[in-house]
Amino acid sequence: GLGDVYKRQAYNGRFADLASKSASIVTGVKDGKLVIEKINGKYFMYWGEKAVYAATSDNLIDWEPVLDENNELRKIAVPRAGYFDSRLTECGPPAIKTVNGIVLLYNGKNGDEMDWDPDFPEGAYCAGQFLFDANDPYKVLDRLDKPFFVPEAAFEKSGQYKDGTVF
């Protein structure tokens, strides 16, 4: 994720109360291995829980959050009412640049009866996918309407996340 220093000290603590524990740096596949790649001359990272945000870096150490025209964090994608990801969209493993675009896997959390997908339990975490434009990593080309991986086994529906999780 972005780390305590980034959130609490940078930007005068503007993002200190923003929940985020994971981030996905864009990679490519070279000789069967994931290798971090630049997009338009910068390293690019998707991050966030309540929305998918972005940050860029010249050196993989110092990250600049991508801001919108109001100087707020730019929301690249947000939860959707009525879908499995109606509560949050939490970035997962490294995003992968493919011939079709950038694939980002994420944990989608189902909301409650006010905004949920009734095909899944309230609060269930299911895995979703975004496809972003490889040259414009802010542009969503596609997004799954149904998760590709859902909690089914008993151990996925017990413990800390009794409603189910696959991350």
Protein language model regions, located:
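Conserved blade-ending motifs and adjacent loop-strand segments that build the rim/top face
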Residues: 74-88, 138-167
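Beta-rich catalytic cores
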Residues: 19-22, 89-91, 125, 167
